[in-house]
Regions:
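A Lys/Arg-rich helix-loop hairpin that forms a DNA/phosphate-binding surface
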Residues: 1-13, 58, 62, 185-186
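Short, polar N-cap/turn motifs at the start of nucleic acid-interacting alpha helices
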Residues: 47, 108-116, 181-182, 201-220, ...
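C-terminal catalytic core of tyrosine-transesterase DNA break-rejoin enzymes
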Residues: 23, 41, 90, 94-101, ...
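Short basic/aromatic active-site micro-motif
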Residues: 4, 85, 181-200
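Catalytic-site neighborhood detector that most strongly recognizes the C-terminal catalytic loop/helix
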Residues: 56-57, 64, 117-125, 210-235
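Basic, Lys/Arg- and aromatic-enriched nucleic-acid-binding interface segment
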Residues: 19-31, 41-104, 122-127, 147-150, ...
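Active-site/catalytic core of tyrosine-dependent DNA strand-transfer enzymes
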Residues: 68-71, 121, 131-181, 259
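C-terminal secondary-structure termini that scaffold catalytic or DNA-interacting sites
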Residues: 75, 136-138, 142-151, 156-161, ...
Length: 259
């Protein structure tokens, strides 16, 4: 720990980058920076060798589920043999929740149509309450009727956690069956947000539904407002333009004489 130099960290970052994983290289450096910061606090060394390492430029990936892809995915979900995984993905589509939140959902967390997420399952480690739509509640009712024996978790398993922890395999199978490429499970959350925008929801409302503690996180969806904003400004423009034009003369119809 005490012998690690800037050159060592820089060489590691370059090596991982050259292997074709520039983002992983950045994550590694970030982890090392945290480790050495703790080492300084614990008086194990005086400097952080990560300081000054130039990170690789990252491009924020934006991928959303198209209308056609949604239809194909829905059909694939109906035929998928793993009903629990399929239902978990349906809930992801209907709630915009994170994968970990859905998989750790407890029956006791849902009451009167509201899902109260426990701090242990949320990214912010805080309570988050969100109302569930009628289709989401119907799906949960169907899952509960099918669940035998009853379990505390909506998606139980025999593992250490007591609930499903991974659905990557099912997701890969579903994407292949639906002919969908380049779509991650987390992209369903982005797709949910884009649908909220299309429905006229404001950024603060979207942030509240998604459980964002930082408004800047929600601002990534601001570009989706371009279409409704364009429509709104066109309406105003039409009114202003019409006000500046002279009124069209009203043609008086000649009254025909009686025969």
């Amino acid at each position: 720990m005490a012998d690690v130099r800037f050159e060592d960290v820089d060489a590691l970052h370059r090596k991982i980058t050259k292997s074709g994983s520039p983002y992983a290289a950045n994550r590694t450096v970030a982890l090392l920076s945290k480790m050495f910061s703790l080492a300084i606090r614990w008086h194990m060394r005086e400097t952080n060798p990560v300081k000054g390492i130039e990170r690789n430029k990252e491009y924020h990936r934006r991928r959303y589920l198209s209308g056609d892809e949604l239809v194909r995915l829905t059909k694939a979900l109906a035929k998928h043999p793993d009903k629990e995984a399929a239902d978990a993905i349906r809930l992801l589509l209907l709630t915009g929740a994170r994968r970990g939140e859905i998989l750790a959902m407890r029956w006791e967390d849902v009451e009167n149509g509201v899902w109260s997420k426990s701090p242990s399952s949320t990214k912010q480690k805080e309570h988050h309450q969100v109302p569930l739509s009628a289709p989401a509640l119907q799906l949960l009712e169907d899952v509960r009727k099918r669940q035998r024996p009853r379990a505390p978790f909506v998606f139980p398993s025999h593992g250490a956690t007591g609930h499903l922890v991974e659905i990557k395999r099912s997701w890969a199978q579903l994407c292949k069956a639906a002919g969908i490429e380049g779509l991650r499970i987390h992209d369903l959350r982005h797709s949910y947000a884009s649908q909220l925008v299309s429905g006229g929801a404001s950024l603060p409302l979207i942030g509240a539904l998604l459980g964002h503690s930082n408004p800047l996180t929600t601002s990534r969806y601001a570009h989706h407002f371009n279409d409704p904003l364009k429509a709104a400004t066109e309406k105003v423009g039409a009114v202003i333009a019409a006000a500046g034009k002279p009124a069209k003369p009203v043609l008086k119809l000649k009254r025909r004489g009686r025969p």
